[in-house]
């Protein structure tokens, strides 16, 4: 035994030296520097010693690999070496990409000669590899443009849709006048969108058709007057489009006005090799970026509004910042890892040239943000390590004010740090923050809406549901995420067979299915006090059910709906649950 311990002691230095040698060899092979203090191009650009186009030429000529914003594949299985080197590599990669995008944007505003725009066009193919620039620059460039299809079957390619500023009715089209003397994104913003246009946009593929039909029915009930545009990548069948048109235009009731429905196919704008990378959540970027409206309201298919959407444009926060975001459920136990927080801090520090770790640096950040809700988001990220902050089921975004944040968000969504957050959500506001742009969140916390469970005492209440709700300052429902059935997922077989506590409550799979597919009952809302009684996850609906709790005078806020509110909400619930 003593001899074995001695052998291990002798081998330990050898093992350590071997591992260290492997790390050194790996870094040499990958051309990583040994002294890595995360200097970025942004610092060089700010020095004023080099004109931005000279810097772009230098990067384009000598550092082409650093210029390309390729899409990264998530790597769930990481070797020891990649674990050791990853954080530094991720900071350098993302900081470099952000710096290159910033440099491109600055140069876009300083074009002085033909060679400048030629260089920018060359750089664009590397910074935005998902755009089909080959088609745009070919003799058949007309085929690059997305195809608009109106509900009546009329198709337009290479046209700008025009809507009345008085009643949002369709009044015609005008040709897109793309100028070779302008950068791509500036061209798109100035020539492919009607100035000050507003509308509803959704990203829809086949599996979202049923929920989208339900959403359109609700929009009709709300007397929606905004045009609706459904964005897809040629992955929405003609038969499905006809079902959506019927939902938007059928004359079953004079009280429900027909909708100005459009379809936008953006497939030809995208490089084939990147087409499949835009799936699920990431399709939102295509919808918001390429939709026909300057100021779109983006909706998830399972979002349900309870107020006319055009009234949201009147919210003070949106009018002040050009954005309106809503908060997600707050989970104290769902945290970013210390390494993830460190990486994000370093990227923020590099991008904004300020230390978010120091008290003075954070005070500078707060002063620059100048918005309590935005400051709260940053504090939640940096100090509370909060992984979930934004619910992106409804987003309002003024592209005239903040357009270039969209390509930045796309880069972040597909960067090496894409796994830090769930889907698209946090990249909306982080792209604005890193770009030093204004943004805000609606000031009311996210809530749980549904049926009040029988209280243990008269002073306590609980609501358990799959719906995430958002209320105004008076307690009225603005909108919710998650549809209006008890559980929108077809998971009754799984829950019944895998969850003993669920099987004990229901006699059969059919009984559980009937319950899951039944309409919700909207009786009240509880806004939890997460510091005292946080959201709790339940086993129903494959763990998509959450409970919030209220105890009078101690924690939470209970809002019980009036009879008139309940009657109105029941009407929305009934309409949403009609057979599709």
Swiss-Prot record:
SUPFAM superfamilies: Nucleotide-diphospho-sugar transferases. PANTHER family: ALPHA-1,3-MANNOSYLTRANSFERASE MNN1-RELATED (PTHR31392:SF1). GO terms for cellular component: Golgi apparatus; membrane. The gene is MNT4. It comes from the Eukaryota. The chain crosses the membrane at residues 11-29. GO terms for biological process: protein O-linked glycosylation. Belongs to the MNN1/MNT family. Residues 30-580 are lumenal. InterPro entries: Alpha_mannosyltransferase, Nucleotide-diphossugar_trans. This is Probable alpha-1,3-mannosyltransferase MNT4. It comes from Saccharomyces cerevisiae (strain ATCC 204508 / S288c) (Baker's yeast). Glycans are attached at residues 132, 167, 223, 349. It is found in: Membrane. Its EC number is 2.4.1.-. GO terms for molecular function: alpha-1,3-mannosyltransferase activity. The keyword Transmembrane helix applies. It is a single-pass type II membrane protein. Keywords: Glycoprotein, Glycosyltransferase, Membrane, Signal-anchor, Transferase, Transmembrane, Transmembrane helix. Residues 1-10 are cytoplasmic.
């Amino acid at each position: 035994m003593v001899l074995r311990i001695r052998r291990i002691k002798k081998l330990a230095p050898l093992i350590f030296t071997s591992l260290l040698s492997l790390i050194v060899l790996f870094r040499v092979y990958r051309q990583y520097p040994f002294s890595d203090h995360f200097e970025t191009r942004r610092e060089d650009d700010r020095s004023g010693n080099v004109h931005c186009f000279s810097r772009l030429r230098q990067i384009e000529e000598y550092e082409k690999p650093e210029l390309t914003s390729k899409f990264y594949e998530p790597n769930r299985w990481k070797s020891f070496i990649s674990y050791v080197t990853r954080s530094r590599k991720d900071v350098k990669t993302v900081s470099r990409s952000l710096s290159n995008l910033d440099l491109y944007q600055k140069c876009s505003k300083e074009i002085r000669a033909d060679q400048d725009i030629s260089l920018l066009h060359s750089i664009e193919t590397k910074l935005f590899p998902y755009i089909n620039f080959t088609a745009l620059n070919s003799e058949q460039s007309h085929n690059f443009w997305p195809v608009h299809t109106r509900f009546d079957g009329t198709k337009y390619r290479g046209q700008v849709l025009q809507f009345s500023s008085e009643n949002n009715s369709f009044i015609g089209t005008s040709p897109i006048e793309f100028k070779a003397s302008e950068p791509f994104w500036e061209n798109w913003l100035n020539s492919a969108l009607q100035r000050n246009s507003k509308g509803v946009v959704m990203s829809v593929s086949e599996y979202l058709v049923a929920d989208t039909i339900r959403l359109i029915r609700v929009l009709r009930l709300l007397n929606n007057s905004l045009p609706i545009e459904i964005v897809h990548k040629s992955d929405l069948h003609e038969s499905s489009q006809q079902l959506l048109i019927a939902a938007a235009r059928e004359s079953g009731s004079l009280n429900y006005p027909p909708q100005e429905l459009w379809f936008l196919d953006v497939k030809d704008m995208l490089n084939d090799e990147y087409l499949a990378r835009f799936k699920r959540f990431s399709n939102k970027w295509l919808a918001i970026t390429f939709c026909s409206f300057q100021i779109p309201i983006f909706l998830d298919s399972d979002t349900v509004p309870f107020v006319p959407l055009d009234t949201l444009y009147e919210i003070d926060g949106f009018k002040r910042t050009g954005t309106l975001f809503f908060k997600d459920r707050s989970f104290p136990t769902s945290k970013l890892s210390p390494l993830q927080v460190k990486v994000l801090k370093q990227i923020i520090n590099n991008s904004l040239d300020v230390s978010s770790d120091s008290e003075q640096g954070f005070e500078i950040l707060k002063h620059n943000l100048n918005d309590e809700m935005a400051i709260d988001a940053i504090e939640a990220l940096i100090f509370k390590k909060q992984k979930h902050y934004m619910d992106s089921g409804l987003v309002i975004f003024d592209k005239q004010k903040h357009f270039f944040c969209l390509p930045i968000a796309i880069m972040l969504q597909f960067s090496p740090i894409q796994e830090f957050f769930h889907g698209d959500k946090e990249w909306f506001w982080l792209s604005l923050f890193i770009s030093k742009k204004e943004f805000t969140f609606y000031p009311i916390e996210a809530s749980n809406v549904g049926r009040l469970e029988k209280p243990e005492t008269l002073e306590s209440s609980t609501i358990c549901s799959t719906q995430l709700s958002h209320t105004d300052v008076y307690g009225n429902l603005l909108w919710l995420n998650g549809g209006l059935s008890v559980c929108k997922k077809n998971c009754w077989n799984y829950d019944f067979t895998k969850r003993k506590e669920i099987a004990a409550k229901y006699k059969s799979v059919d009984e559980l299915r009937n319950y899951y597919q039944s309409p919700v009952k909207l009786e009240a809302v509880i806004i939890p006090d997460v510091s005292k009684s946080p959201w709790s996850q339940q086993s129903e609906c494959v763990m998509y059910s959450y409970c919030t709790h209220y105890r009078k005078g101690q924690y939470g806020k209970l809002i019980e709906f009036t009879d008139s509110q309940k009657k109105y909400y029941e009407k929305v619930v009934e309409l949403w649950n009609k057979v599709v």
